[in-house]
């Protein structure tokens, strides 16, 4: 059982590292999760790789018996990459580019993204392939989250046409017959005539839109598989996982298909986010946990468990004393075998300032610290039974194509 925190030492003065790791150890942790947003630190300029920062963090963590979950940093591309290859940025439906500064702003069909992501992942794997402290690799971060699962750029248009060309064996008439394009004079003479299903009068052909949903999913799954393959080519025994966000059934990506390329699934469990005035109900939280367990039909990790209020620019409900601890227990009861709290300490600047941590930004140990400490102390006693699989008596069957089809054509106001 791995018990830990998500630690971002790059946000803090180097002089704080030793005290941080001492306190993380006192908290009851045996692992830390690092590096998932550290691309610029590891490659400050194109081709100039420098792993010294995280080497030092790992070395000092190992001295305290802490193990490492290492994240590939592809969720946040560096500024120099966006400047050199602006086409790497994804596009909104109206054709405007997503600008550098957020996260997941890249296009999943960008050849440049594959090139540069491949370089940093390969360099990381080569550098850390003999590091025994690394217990797992996390590829990217929350793939498909926050509308990053949709892009309408020229690269996606050409890739979508290639996808359809392959699906229909280059036979455009087969596509016409399948889609029923003869109505509304939608018939195509060539795959290069096929548009992206952006805004139009009324709506696009539903079969075209369904294939677009399938294509969007495949684009993200392919990118995840690319990273897993790279890691395992260099580190054959690497344990590879991904931290899935909530709301998986509403994404433009089939997380069950993505999970086939992982050794196990992990989940970022947020009963509260942003301006929510109340947390999710216990049954909604349970559904999310069961969904993650069902992705590979096996136990899972929680890579982000909250301990304070959360949000990018606004917060709502703040967990009451022992409420976040209760959510952590609920996770363990539904198949979680290792858990990491997001995050060790809240930030004083930069993105996610309102994502509060185990410690607040003033670095003072208060109720939240001792709440996590007590949870870790208690849950260790159940490490062995929590490793056993959960055998459900009831199943909920879902299908990505069916969910997408209902998004496209709701059919009736009675089907809600």
Where are these regions (language model features)?
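Carbohydrate-binding surfaces of carbohydrate-active enzymes
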Residues: 191-194, 263, 267-416
């Amino acid at each position: 059982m791995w018990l830990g925190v998500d630690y971002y030492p790059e946000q803090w003065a180097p002089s704080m590292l030793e005290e941080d790791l001492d306190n993380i150890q006192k908290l009851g942790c045996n692992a830390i999760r690092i590096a998932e947003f550290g691309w610029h630190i590891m490659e400050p300029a194109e081709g100039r790789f420098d792993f010294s920062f995280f080497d030092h963090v790992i070395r000092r963590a190992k001295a305290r018996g802490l193990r490492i979950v290492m994240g590939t940093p592809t969720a946040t591309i560096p500024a120099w990459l966006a400047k050199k290859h602006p086409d790497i940025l994804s596009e909104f439906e109206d054709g405007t580019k997503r600008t550098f500064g957020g996260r997941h702003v890249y296009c999943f069909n960008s050849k440049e993204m594959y090139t540069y992501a491949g370089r940093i992942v390969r360099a990381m794997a080569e550098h850390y392939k003999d590091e025994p402290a690394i217990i797992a690799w996390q590829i990217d971060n929350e793939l498909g989250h926050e509308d990053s699962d949709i892009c309408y750029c020229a690269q996606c248009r050409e890739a979508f046409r290639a996808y359809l060309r392959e699906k229909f064996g280059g036979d455009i008439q087969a596509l016409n017959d399948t889609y029923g394009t003869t109505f509304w004079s939608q018939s195509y003479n060539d795959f290069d005539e096929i548009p992206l299903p952006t805004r139009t009068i009324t709506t696009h052909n539903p079969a075209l839109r369904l294939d677009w949903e399938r294509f969007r999913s495949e684009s993200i799954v392919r990118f995840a598989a690319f990273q897993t393959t790279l890691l395992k080519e260099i580190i054959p025994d690497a344990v590879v996982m991904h931290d899935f966000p909530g709301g998986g059934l509403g994404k433009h990506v089939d997380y069950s298909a993505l999970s086939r390329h992982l050794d196990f699934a992990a989940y970022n469990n947020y009963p509260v986010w942003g301006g929510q005035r109340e947390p999710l109900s216990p049954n909604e939280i349970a559904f999310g946990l069961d969904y993650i367990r069902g992705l590979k039909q096996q136990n899972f990790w929680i890579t982000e468990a909250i301990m304070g209020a959360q949000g990018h620019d606004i917060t709502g409900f703040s967990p009451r004393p022992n409420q976040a601890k209760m959510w952590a227990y609920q996770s363990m009861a539904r198949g979680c075998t290792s858990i990491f709290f997001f995050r060790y300490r809240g930030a004083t600047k930069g993105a996610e300032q309102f994502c509060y941590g185990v410690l607040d930004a003033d670095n003072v140990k208060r109720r939240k610290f001792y709440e996590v400490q007590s949870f870790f102390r208690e849950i260790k006693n159940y490490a062995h039974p929590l490793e056993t699989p959960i055998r459900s008596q009831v199943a909920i069957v879902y299908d990505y194509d069916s969910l997408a089809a209902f998004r496209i054509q709701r059919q009736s106001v009675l089907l809600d």
